[in-house]
Amino acid sequence: VLFRSEKFYAEFPKRMARVRAVLNRPLTLTEKIIYTHLYHQDAMKDFARGKDYIELRPDRAGTHDIGGPMAIIQFLTSKKERIALPAAMVCDHLVQANRGAIPDLKVADKGNWETYSFLRTVSGRYGFDFWPAGSGICHQVFLENYDFPGGMMLVTDSHTPTACGLGM
C-alpha cells in the first residue's frame, strides 16, 4: 500500500468523538466520512443539505493523463514547491485499445511521449506518485493502491467514485 493510513486511523477516534459531541445524533457512513474530513474542524455544525457549502480535506488526490496536464499547469502557476496533498498521476486515458496490450502501449508511447515525459518530470519534481502507461486503468490503480475504509480521495475521473462502494 502506497498510502499510509495509520495516521488517519490514529486520529479518527478523536475526530469522531468531536463529531458526535457537536451533532449529538446518529450518523450515516457518508456523514462520518464527510465530517471527519472537514477542512476546518472548528467550523463543525449540523450542515443543512442543499444549502450549506462545506470545505473538505481529502486524504489523497488523483488524476490521469487527460485531466492531469491542465491541473498541473494550474498548479505550476501557484509557484508552490510541492503539492500539499498526496496525489497520484496515472497514464491510461491516452492508450487506445485496438490490437492488444503490447502493440497498443507502443503506439501510445510513440504518440504521447511528450505528454508522458512532461507528466513524469512534473510528478517527480512536485511529489506526485507517477504511474506510466501500462500500469493499469486509474480506477483500479487508485482502488488497489490507495483505497482504505473511511478515507476520502478526490479524483478527476468520473468513474473513480466506484472506490467509495468498496470502502473509501
Which ranges hold each PLM region?
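Fe-S-dependent hydro-lyases/dehydratases of central metabolism
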Residues: 3-168
